[in-house]
């Protein structure tokens, strides 16, 4: 009954702060409960939570899953003190929250790790890839080694019915972030959008939906997909190929911080310290561990998105309006 009551109180508070939780999960039965508000799929981080509570029978973890934009808005509205940790892959929104004073300081142990202003800790890296259905693309798949090659291939496709998908930057904070990073790295970004739109471009909210479309054959390719969401599907989808372009491969940091209203800073910091520990990292998928930077890579260099004030620039309303003015023109040009 205690857990049901706590769950009801937290979910009621979340709804009052503009959140529409995608799920609420509990790991462990200890009375010292740390509550995490995050964007990541619970199944992918549950092993880390399980390892944390196994170290002490007094500990438990409650995880509330929601979208990055709703989490950002809820933090700004003022979180209930029961929320101990905020985790998100929308690193630009996270950096802005810290800059605006919504975090608490990390421990000395954590400030030695990759962090921003001693308050935001990086605990995972998500490499970004392009996904293709080789049954639809055919032998050409081996030629798609770079974004330039992809653009040229799209130009050469005259047959009808070719479809593609990518994040919709209006729906997805991660999609907007990746679009901005592509613009910084690649002068051909808008040309790529032009060529995708010349066929049938279907912007999407989520990596999972994009992957489903490629697996089913509804889309021939998905641009800018989170790699760790793809790898569990490969054994059951032999037609699916991952492309790691040789020009660059973005990687999104997953980050966490202790919100300023949190009651139990010490327990929150214990959880964050476990996430970046060797034991915690070993419980994550190998594709997202911080050591992914050291792996042999079939494509170009992995370029992690750096924690810096530069991430905040494109969140300016004028900059957003300018981007979406061009996005609307280019993404709908041939549709």
What residues fall within each predicted segment?
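Conserved C-terminal helix/tail region of periplasmic/extracytoplasmic solute-binding proteins
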Residues: 313-335
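Mature extracytoplasmic/periplasmic domains
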Residues: 259-315
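Early extracytoplasmic/lumenal segment of secretory-pathway proteins
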Residues: 17-96
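A bilobed periplasmic-binding-protein/Venus flytrap-type ligand-binding module shared by bacterial periplasmic
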Residues: 129-136, 178-180, 252-267, 283-284
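A ligand-binding cleft/hinge motif common to bilobed small-molecule-binding domains
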Residues: 91-96, 215-239
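Extracytoplasmic ligand-binding site segments that recognize negatively charged/polar headgroups
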Residues: 39, 46, 82, 89-90, ...
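Short beta-strand->loop
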Residues: 104-110, 119-122, 238-250, 259-260
